[in-house]
């Protein structure tokens, strides 16, 4: 693992989550959350960001998927923030559009230590696979606030909910890749001198 890597665990009465992340990877992943569609989305994120990612989770799925998905977002966000360290030499910003058939999605990121989420997407279905569509925004909110990033996600247009969610995760991965890439200098990318 590189110097930009982290391992985080979160154990509560509702869930047990373990995340390993290496920002300087090649997109390898091993994902087992107990929620097949989320596994697919996290695999796509890893591949598109080129971040190596292992996620193992067990949760109270007999209740619903909320606790598991939110806790994965929290733990992944914490690991991401820890992996970045003091943020010397990163680009800081990343923006990417991804088309998927009839859908076009946008992700824009500022690794600013100013957590915020703007999420603009409507879903027609209650679930895609075993994953509640209402949990898409909850995952990204948990990630953004624990990673300390400003994250804007928008589906500009589209019909199929699977395509919308997949395009969002791919765009998110590509924007992360751009934001965490090393710039030509080793400065902190802020006039304040810190992030």
From Swiss-Prot:
InterPro entries to which the protein is assigned, alphabetical: IGPD_sf, ImidazoleglycerolP_deHydtase, ImidazoleglycerP_deHydtase_CS, Ribosomal_Su5_D2-typ_SF
Record-level GO BP terms: L-histidine biosynthetic process
Catalytic reaction annotation: D-erythro-1-(imidazol-4-yl)glycerol 3-phosphate = 3-(imidazol-4-yl)-2-oxopropyl phosphate + H2O
Enzyme class per UniProt: lyase
SUPFAM superfamilies, sorted: Ribosomal protein S5 domain 2-like (SSF54211)
GO cellular component assignments: cytoplasm
Gene Ontology MF terms: imidazoleglycerol-phosphate dehydratase activity
Subcellular location: Cytoplasm
Chief localization: cytoplasm
Metabolic or biological pathway: Amino-acid biosynthesis; L-histidine biosynthesis; L-histidine from 5-phospho-alpha-D-ribose 1-diphosphate: step 6/9
Protein keywords: Amino-acid biosynthesis, Cytoplasm, Histidine biosynthesis, Lyase
Enzyme Commission number(s) from the entry: 4.2.1.19
Pfam families named among the record's database cross-references: IGPD
PROSITE patterns: IGP_DEHYDRATASE_2
NCBIfam families: PRK00951.1-2, PRK00951.2-1, PRK00951.2-4
Family per similarity comment: Belongs to the imidazoleglycerol-phosphate dehydratase family.
Name under which the protein is recorded: Imidazoleglycerol-phosphate dehydratase
Organism: Clostridium beijerinckii (strain ATCC 51743 / NCIMB 8052)
């Amino acid at each position: 693992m590189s110097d930009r890597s982290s391992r985080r665990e979160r154990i509560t009465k509702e869930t047990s989550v373990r995340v390993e992340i290496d920002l300087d990877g090649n997109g390898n992943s091993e994902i087992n959350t107990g929620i097949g569609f989320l596994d697919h989305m996290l695999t796509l994120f890893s591949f598109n960001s080129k971040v190596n990612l292992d996620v193992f989770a067990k949760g109270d799925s007999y209740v619903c998927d909320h606790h598991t998905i939110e806790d994965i977002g929290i733990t992944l966000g914490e690991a991401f923030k820890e992996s970045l360290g003091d943020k010397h030499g990163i680009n800081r910003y990343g923006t990417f559009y991804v088309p998927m058939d009839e859908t076009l999605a946008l992700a824009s990121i500022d690794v600013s230590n100013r957590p915020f989420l703007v999420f603009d997407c409507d879903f027609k279905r209650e679930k895609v696979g075993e994953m509640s569509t209402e949990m898409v925004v909850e995952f990204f909110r948990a990630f953004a606030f624990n990673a300390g990033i400003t994250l804007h996600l928008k589906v500009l247009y589209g019909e199929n909910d699977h395509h919308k969610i997949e395009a969002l995760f791919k765009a998110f991965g590509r924007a992360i890749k751009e934001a965490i890439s090393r710039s030509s200098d080793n400065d902190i990318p802020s006039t304040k001198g810190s992030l």
